[in-house]
Every structure is written in C-alpha cells, then in structure tokens.
C-alpha cells in the first residue's frame, strides 16, 4: 500500500495570469473560458509518483500586487508555492519578484519550495517576458522554472508534479520542512 503524503500548495501571482485556470485544468481536466476574479478557492487531487501518493490541497489565491500583504495562512503550513506570471505581461513578472521577496521574508529567509511558472505560453506572439528571463530569475532563487498553457493543457500536469518534486528536494536538503520555526 502506498504511503500517502499531504501537501498544501499555494498558487500566487498577479491578477489574470491564469492561476485558477492552471488549478482547474489540473484537477478537472478542462479550461475555464470566462474570467471571474478569484477571492480564494481550494482544489484537491491525489497524485501517484513512484510508490507514493500525494494528496494535494491547492490554495488558489486572489491576484496580488506589490502592495498586497500575504496572510499567515499562506505562510504557515504551506509546503510549496507555484508563483505564476503571464508571458505576455511584464508587469506580472515584476509582481512575482515582489511576492517571492515577501514569502522569503515571511519564512525567515529560509529556502523555499518554489516553482516559477510562465503561463499563457499559447500567447507567445504577444510575449513580453522571454523564457530565459524566467529561468534566470528562478535560478537566482534556487527554484525550478517552466512555462505552461492552461488553455492548451500544455504541461499543466507537470506544474504540480514539479512542485511536489521541489518540495521533496528542499525537504531532503534541509530536513523536514514542517520542523521549521516560523517568525511572526
């Protein structure tokens, strides 16, 4: 019988970058056409990786900006983060830098389990952020990077598989993440 591990993952980013679309595509297997701003939603899905099962609890947040204050509910008890920007919005890329800084400070400047995602790769002709810029930013954080398209279901499953792998990588390099001390 496989070991079941619970993982809480917060999805953060500027408004209209496709956070809800990524989560919905992953869990429900369909793209949401209309845009209805999210206040906060949760999604759950169980994923099997190797011999282990992971019960993912996804927290789909409202769009943040540089003035947003991250609540402690997005710091305490969260195992990993998917920071999302839109490849056709330089502003969303700048906001994701601020969000990472706030998370980093909220966690006491310890290493975080973060996956940086350039979403809306299907809008590449309107691109304002090159993939190399996303990769460079993620490397500066010691994080993983990928691009995806919730609309085309391009690498949507991989986003959440990679964040599970990133959580394991960080836990293995620093010991169990849930043993950390949180500063409030």
From Swiss-Prot:
Q: Could you give a single Gene Ontology term from the biological process aspect?
A: TOR signaling
Read off the lineage from the record. Answer: Eukaryota, Metazoa, Chordata, Craniata, Vertebrata
**Where is a lipid covalently linked (S-farnesyl cysteine)?**
181
EC assignment: the record states 3.6.5.-
Q: Which PANTHER family does the UniProt entry name for this protein?
A: RAS, DI-RAS, AND RHEB FAMILY MEMBERS OF SMALL GTPASE SUPERFAMILY
> Which gene specifies this protein's sequence?
Rhebl1
* Proregion span(s): 182-184
**What is this enzyme's catalytic activity, as reactions?**
GTP + H2O = GDP + phosphate + H(+)
Any idea which positions bind GTP? 16-21, 32-38, 63, 119-122, 149-150
Identify the species of origin.
Mus musculus
A GO CC term? membrane
Q: What is the recorded membrane topology of this protein? A: Lipid-anchor
Q: Which SMART domains match?
A: RAB, RAS, RHO
The UniProt record lists the keyword Cytoplasm: yes
Q: Where does Mg(2+) bind?
A: 38
Q: What is this protein called?
A: GTPase RhebL1
Which keywords fit this entry according to its UniProt record? Cytoplasm, GTP-binding, Hydrolase, Lipoprotein, Magnesium, Membrane, Metal-binding, Methylation, Nucleotide-binding, Prenylation
């Amino acid at each position: 019988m496989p070991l079941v591990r619970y993982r809480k993952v917060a999805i953060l980013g500027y408004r209209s970058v496709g956070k809800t679309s990524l989560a919905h595509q992953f869990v429900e297997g369909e793209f949401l056409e209309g845009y209805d701003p999210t206040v906060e939603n949760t999604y759950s899905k169980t994923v099997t990786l190797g011999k282990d099962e992971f019960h993912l609890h996804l927290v789909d947040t409202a769009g943040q900006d540089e003035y947003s204050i991250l609540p402690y509910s997005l710091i305490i008890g969260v195992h990993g983060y998917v920071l999302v920007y839109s490849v056709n919005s330089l502003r969303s890329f700048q906001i994701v830098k601020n969000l990472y800084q706030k998370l980093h400070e909220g966690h006491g400047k310890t290493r975080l389990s973060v996956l940086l995602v350039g979403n809306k790769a299907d809008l590449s002709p309107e691109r304002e952020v090159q993939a190399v810029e996303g990769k460079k930013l993620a490397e500066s954080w010691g994080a993983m990077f990928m691009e995806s398209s919730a609309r085309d279901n391009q690498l949507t499953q991989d986003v959440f598989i990679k964040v599970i792998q990133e959580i394991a990588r960080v836990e293995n390099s620093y010991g169990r993440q849930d043993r950390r001390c949180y500063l409030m």
